[in-house]
A protein has these predicted regions:
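Extracellular/periplasmic carbohydrate-active domains that bind, remodel
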Residues: 19-501
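Bacterial N-terminal signal peptides
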Residues: 7-17
Length: 501
């Protein structure tokens, strides 16, 4: 009996100690008035908690204008419902932490190469949690293009993590996350769950990471990628992204902010009225919508043991699998996916030779990929499915099973490319072969195939692939060249069998 009482007393003491390890940012001077810069108070709370061995840094309801928040190991940063963290506008010589010094990035852009110029950042940490029902407003963050990319005091990411372990980010809501809402580079054991992200560029960038679980996230990113895996050379070494599971997520490309307010605004049907900034060039472009699930483009390292399942894509891009810089993309399974009103290629593979890697890096590979149980309705017809390698470098061992693709149709072979260039070094996207949206007064330029374009492939199985069109389209269903060892079972066009290539 005495032993039992002693154990209970010890447990109670432990519980009280755990309860006591809460550091309220208001106790450290945070005003929460939306005007006063509260990051010094938040950082003071984090520093105190870290010095005490860890604990919860508690952000109660209120509006917290902030510059860079410096995370620490063994810290749980918790935002109560009603807490709004506002990325403050740099002014009067004050602003966010400067990007850490280092050599000019050779193989990836500035945004991928720095972490401290962020609203929240951590380097070399472990046991970090950021959670709660709070709201993170990054409206004053840089989109990562233009003249302010490298200016001190300007931040271009909401959360940036480098070489951290045991990370949990859950249940928060984000608006306008900058160039990256999350950039995680070289992170091991990370859980991203229950996040709502309505952002202007990339939402979740998972770069050179291992053992990652992404689940139950709502992601809207009209001008760039939704959930994207990368394997850049940002750490100065080759590193794969591997053992990643993505499940139960909704991806879209509606106008920024319109998912959070539940209006789901589409771009006008006339593409000329949709001026936007091309995130890769900084120039004005005419845009319908973006967002997608993607492996690449940065691919000095590879992608291994990846599973994507039970996700929806709406009014956005599709599924993109790319090896451009020498990485090996292999052992990937994608299943139980629905798409509606998607605006470029529903399924896009590209093995290319951009080679943004150290000199002498060989061309990469794409092999052992299974895509199954995909239903796509009312996809734009300009691009179709595209699966392409380059001369002498084949996409290999791919199975596409039980996939239904419905296209808008209404295109004409008069607008199609007469020949499709190799473009082995071009940026990999469905328009990379010379396609374009309509220029005012001119027709679009589209792919010669209305259903699927295949080139430089070895060993591919189509088992239950079904095409249908909402309007007539007089282009060839499938255009292929240099394709070896193809198996076609139960491939149909408008319910009628397609016998072969």
């Amino acid at each position: 009996m005495k032993k039992t009482i002693m154990i209970l007393a010890m447990l109670a003491a432990f519980a009280l100690q755990a309860f006591a390890a809460v550091y309220n940012v208001r106790d450290f001077g945070a005003k929460a008035d939306g005007v006063t810069i509260d990051s010094p108070a938040i950082n003071a709370a984090i520093e105190k908690a870290a010095a005490d061995g860890g604990g919860m840094v508690y952000v109660p309801a209120g509006r917290y204008a902030s510059y860079s928040i410096r995370l620490a190991s063994h810290i749980h940063l918790y935002f109560e419902k009603g807490a709004v963290l506002i990325a403050a506008e740099p002014k009067n010589g004050e602003g966010f932490d400067a990007a850490e010094p280092g050599p000019q990035p050779q193989f990836q852009d500035f945004g991928h190469s720095h972490w401290k110029n962020s609203l929240m950042w951590g380097i070399g940490l472990e046991d970090i949690t950021i959670s709660g029902e709070g709201f993170i407003d990054g409206s004053n963050l840089s989109g990562g293009y233009g003249d302010n990319v490298v200016v001190n005091g300007v931040a271009n990411k909401t959360i940036a993590l480098k070489e951290c372990r045991h990370v949990i980010i859950r249940d928060l809501t984000f608006l306008k996350g900058g160039h990256f809402c999350l950039l995680a580079t070289g992170v091991e054991d990370m859980v991203l769950s229950g996040l709502t992200i309505d952002t202007n560029r990339d939402a979740l960038d998972i770069d050179c990471c291992r053992n990652v679980r992404v689940s139950d996230c709502l992601v809207n990113s009209p001008y760039d990628d939704g959930i994207v895996l990368k394997a850049s050379y940002a750490l100065g070494r080759f590193m794969d992204t591997e053992n990643v599971a993505i499940t139960n997520c909704n991806i879209s490309g509606y106008a920024v902010g319109s998912v959070l307010d539940c209006t789901y605004k589409k771009f006008a049907e006339n593409p000329y009225s949709n001026k936007a900034i091309n995130p890769h060039t900084g120039k004005v472009m005419y845009h319908r919508a973006g967002g997608r699930i993607k492996l690449g483009t940065e691919s000095s390292g590879g992608f291994k043991n990846i599973a994507v399942t039970n996700c929806t894509l709406q009014y956005c891009g599709g599924l993109l699998l790319e090896s451009m810089d020498g990485g090996h993309l292999e052992d990937v399974v994608i299943s139980n996916i629905t798409m509606r009103d998607c605006v470029d290629s529903p399924i896009f593979f590209r093995l290319g030779e951009r080679m943004r890697s150290p000199e002498g890096t060989p061309v990469g590979t794409i092999k052992r990929v299974l895509i199954s149980d995909v239903n796509c309705w009312n996809n734009t017809s300009w691009y179709g499915i595209q699966i392409t390698g380059t001369p002498g470098h084949y996409v290999e061992d791919v199975t596409i099973r039980n996939v239904h693709i419905n296209y808008e149709g209404g295109c004409s072979k008069a607008d199609a490319l007469k020949s499709v260039p190799e473009n082995i070094k071009a940026y990999p996207d469905p328009w990379m072969f010379g396609c374009r949206m309509p220029v005012k007064g001119e027709s679009p330029i589209i792919m010669p195939s209305k259903g699927m374009f295949l080139r430089h492939i070895k060993g591919i199985t189509f088992d239950g692939l079904h095409f249908s069109f909402n309007q007539p389209d007089d282009r060839e269903l499938i255009v292929s060249s240099d394709v070896k060892d193809v198996i076609m079972r139960d491939v149909t066009f408008e319910g009628k069998p397609v016998k072969g290539l």
